[in-house]
From Swiss-Prot:
HAMAP family: Hydro_lyase. Keywords: Lyase. InterPro entries: D-Glu_cyclase, Putative_hydro-lyase, UPF0317. GO terms for molecular function: lyase activity. This is Putative hydro-lyase RPA1747. Belongs to the D-glutamate cyclase family. It is an enzyme of class 4 (lyase). Its EC number is 4.2.1.-.
Length: 272
């Protein structure tokens, strides 16, 4: 069953919110991309760290609001974040996780119950899937949704401001757009600073350190038409890259493209 079919199935069930239904699907073992799931609701990237590193990571996010806009944070040792959703359990409610030890990816489980500890702090970081709803509403096509794959993401040569052990380059997501749509996309996404805001770069991927746009570092490649430009947004996978580079003894993140679906409304994130 695809995530799109599963979402429709849960829409038909007697559940209070599509976002809650999506989390229940993940809790039941569904492990697919969440792009296009629960339209209207905010999705988030995930970073979980021991309390020892939480303050420095929080500072890193404050210094780098484009790639790392925090939309929610747990109390120490508490896997529930009530401000983000009904019955939301950070240990079970994402499709897939990544477990890191000393900067190395060691496991990609569908839940982290066995890995949870009393000293962990969870950060939920804004995701570009939220502004995609606004783009679609303006008839701007989103290629990875059309192709039913994960958005392509790339490490760049754009530096992030360091904080404590956390430093490194920005990761960006890419959507191919025709020039007229790219201009409109800048206008639309500028209204959503808490989910990455306006693009950080348009065209010429080599100038931001992307050697081969057909080979993303995360996610899946998508076709780019001859009349289209690659448009790049700051991406919430950036924390994943800097956590790995910092080689902290233990950390957990989401698997790229497989996000936490919250009960927050996208429309409430717009600033204009």
């Amino acid at each position: 069953m695809t995530v799109f079919a599963a979402e429709q199935q849960f829409h038909d069930a007697e559940r209070p919110l599509p976002s809650h239904q999506a989390r229940l699907a993940c809790r039941a073992g569904l492990a697919e991309t969440t792009a296009g799931v629960a339209p209207g609701f905010v999705q988030g990237n995930l970073a979980i760290l021991p309390e020892k590193y939480a303050a420095a990571f929080h500072r890193f996010c404050q210094l780098n609001p484009k790639p790392c806009p925090i939309v929610g944070m747990s109390d120490v040792g508490n896997p529930m974040i009530p401000s983000l959703g009904i019955d939301l359990d950070i240990r079970t409610d994402l499709p897939r996780y990544r477990v890191w030890r000393d900067g190395e990816l060691v496991e990609e489980p569908t839940d982290i119950v066995a890995h949870w500890r009393d000293d962990l702090v969870a950060f939920v970081i804004g995701c570009s899937f939220s502004f995609e709803e606004a783009l679609l509403a303006d008839d701007i096509p989103i290629r990875h949704i059309e192709e039913k794959v994960r958005v392509p993401m790339y490490r760049t040569n754009i530096p992030c401001a360091p904080a404590g052990p956390f430093s490194g380059p920005m990761v960006v997501s890419m959507r191919p757009l025709k020039p007229k749509d790219a201009i409109r996309a800048i206008q639309i996404t500028s209204r959503f600073p808490s989910v990455h805001g306006a693009p950080v770069h348009i065209g010429l991927p080599q100038s931001i350190g992307i050697a081969d746009i057909a080979k993303p570092d995360y996610g899946d490649p998508v076709p780019i038409g001859p009349d289209e430009l690659p448009v790049f947004w700051a991406c919430g996978v950036t924390p994943q890259a800097v956590i790995a580079a910092a080689k902290v003894p233990f950390a957990i993140t989401h698997a790229p493209g497989l996000m936490l679906v919250t009960d927050l409304k996208n429309k409430h994130l717009a600033v204009l």
